[in-house]
Design a protein with these regions (language model features):
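C-terminal accessory regions
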Residues: 227-230, 432-538
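Conserved lysine of the Walker
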Residues: 86
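Signature of the SF2 helicase/ATPase Hel1-core->accessory helical subdomain module
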Residues: 182-290, 459
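Hydrophobic anchor at the beta1->P-loop junction of P-loop NTPases
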Residues: 78
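Conserved RecA-like ASCE ATPase "motif II neighborhood" in helicase/translocase motors
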Residues: 133-223, 431-435
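N-terminal pre-P-loop "Q-motif" helix
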Residues: 39-74
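Conserved helicase/translocase motor-coupling segment
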Residues: 90, 242-245, 274-453, 457-459
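Accessory nucleic-acid engagement/destabilization modules that flank
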Residues: 1-19
Length: 538
């Protein structure tokens, strides 16, 4: 039983000097060529991504279709450093397996809207030149919003018995045509509490305490109804950024505790372990404990091909994600060593206390890059710049930047990422800063990250202090009961500091002597810490 796939991504003679495209450009290239030509970066970066894609298509899917008399089910976890290309793996596999009903799901609304808008703009622009096969593939079949897919499950397949807390398959149910589902940012899937929270759906049964499923439970229940299926989880370590995000262990807990899923096979790499991937809420078992259970049940396969080891986003060095990790862990010595020995000559990180200097530096670097005619040796018509800040950065308003809520700004996000620099809503205009919820999974070429008093370096204790703003003053987010919230706040900066491909500016404001909510001492410790790492002050 052979799965016929588009083998376009298995190329020979990769150009070792050509870097990766941005995710948006990569998606466009998939669309135009109906394969992944043009995604090259070379050397280890290209190799690890291609091995992951090939392993999923050639090994995971084929073994699953042979298992249990053609009714096998599998789940596959793809891990990697921030910017390693996990989302790109998902897009490539989705396109390659369109004939068996593959689709990529994402609960990241901005990412779905930006990629969908980019592909639709491309279709309108190049429709006559695009391959016939491309025109036959709808944008929506490649990538879908997770919310819409869950709604389809309720409307067409799942019959929930109100008051009983049980489910069954609807009479004359329309089973999913998707045999391969790729779930982006699987660590952000909803827990049960968020699934039943009022306002998440117009369906009354979603708001009932007895509803039995978390988001992983619902999606795996649905695929279990098909004759065969592969569920691919793309996992970003330490990137849960919102309440109600279950963490990756919820997928493993569901597989272990649900009797109907006991025959599912599990694929993962040996790197899928440790604090960065384990859930931070303290509930349930660790990944290591689940691995032991699955091994004893003879339903676990470990493959090195499922971990992406090199960062493609920072295409001048894969060490930037390591640097950010050490920075957030307050390991100054390790940061200095990394920056001076591995990063400084390839990827510039500037530090300033003046937002206007940051904007000027972004424009200067953009002009320099365009004048050279390439980004890391790749011809590029566009260098994307933009302003970023955390969703807790409440006191950037005096500098001209307000927190954007997704409900109020989501329709503008595609324009921010895609419009030209003569449009005021474009990122290049540098008037609007987006936060971690809008940019996770996407990237810029050059970014300015504005660092507010929500995350402050404590010089005395060599640790971070966390604060929320309540319109009058900053209140501490304490250890203990609020530890999960603290991890979300740190993860927000991890996301922001790993968005830029060729360089960034970190802005720590001076503060104000006449505004206690922006007092200089709220910022000085953070600035001093970052300066001690050897970043170039401008």
């Amino acid at each position: 039983m052979e799965t016929v796939v588009n083998r376009g991504f298995r190329r020979e003679g990769v150009n070792e000097t050509c870097p990766c495209d941005t995710l948006i450009d990569a998606a466009r290239n998939v669309w135009r060529s109906n394969n992944v030509a043009g995604f090259t970066k070379g050397e280890a970066e290209e190799a690890t991504r291609l091995m992951a894609e090939d392993y999923i298509v050639s090994t995971v899917v084929e073994e699953t279709r042979q298992r249990n008399g053609g009714r096998g089910k599998s789940i596959c976890f793809v891990t990697g450093v921030p910017g390693a290309g996990k989302t790109l793996v998902g897009l490539n596999v989705s396109v390659a397996l369109q004939n068996v009903g593959a689709s990529m799901l994402s609960g990241n609304g901005p990412l779905v809207s930006v990629l969908t808008a980019a592909l639709k703009r491309d279709l309108n622009k190049y429709k006559k030149q695009l391959k016939t096969a491309t025109n036959e593939i709808s944008v929506e079949s490649i990538i879908r919003g997770a919310y819409g897919y869950k709604k389809e499950i309720f409307e067409k397949r799942l019959d929930y018995h109100v008051g009983e807390g049980t489910v069954s398959l609807k009479d004359n149910a329309e089973l999913s045509s998707q045999h391969v589902l790729i779930f982006d940012e699987a660590q952000r899937a909803w827990n049960k509490a968020k699934m039943i929270r009022p306002g998440q759906s117009g369906k009354k049964y979603w708001q009932e305490e007895k509803f039995p499923f978390s988001e992983p439970g619902l999606l795996l229940w649905d695929m279990n109804q098909c004759d065969w299926g592969v569920f691919v989880c793309l996992v970003g370590g330490g990137q849960e950024i919102h309440t109600g995000e279950a963490g990756i262990c919820e997928w493993l807990r569901t597989l272990e505790e649900t009797p109907e899923l006991r025959d599912w096979h599990v694929y993962m790499s040996d790197e899928f372990k440790g604090e960065v991937y384990n859930s931070k809420d303290g509930s349930g078992k660790t990944i290591e404990e689940y691995r032991t259970i699955f091994e004893a049940q003879n339903r676990l396969t470990i493959s090195k091909d499922l971990h992406l080891t090199a960062c493609q986003r920072s295409n001048r060095t894969e060490k930037v994600s390591d640097f950010v990790e050490q920075l957030l862990n307050c390991n100054a010595d390790a940061c200095r060593t990394l920056y001076n020995n591995e990063i400084k000559g390839k990827y510039k990180i500037y530090l300033t206390r003046d937002v206007e200097k940051a904007k000027a530096k972004l424009r200067e670097r953009k002009a320099e890059t365009l004048n050279k005619g390439f980004v890391d040796g790749q011809n590029d018509e566009e260098v994307r710049i933009g302003m970023l800040m955390s969703s807790k950065a409440a006191r950037m308003r005096p500098l001209g930047y307000e927190i954007k809520k997704e409900s109020q700004y989501k329709d503008k996000v595609p324009s921010w990422f895609l419009d030209s620099d003569d449009t005021v809503v474009s990122s290049d205009f540098l008037e609007i800063a987006l936060n971690e919820f809008f940019v996770q999974g996407l990237e810029l070429d050059l970014a300015a990250v504005m660092w507010d008093a929500d995350l402050r370096y404590n010089e005395q204790n060599n640790e971070w202090d966390y604060f929320d703003f309540n319109d009058r003053y900053w209140s501490a987010v304490d250890k203990g009961e609020q530890e999960l919230k603290r991890s979300y706040m740190k993860n927000a900066y991890r996301v922001l500091l790993t968005r830029a491909r060729i360089g960034m500016v970190i802005v720590v404001p001076y503060g104000s002597q006449v505004d206690k909510t922006r007092a200089p001492e709220l910022y000085d410790g953070t600035y001093n810490y970052l300066k001690s790492l050897g970043l170039e002050d401008i």
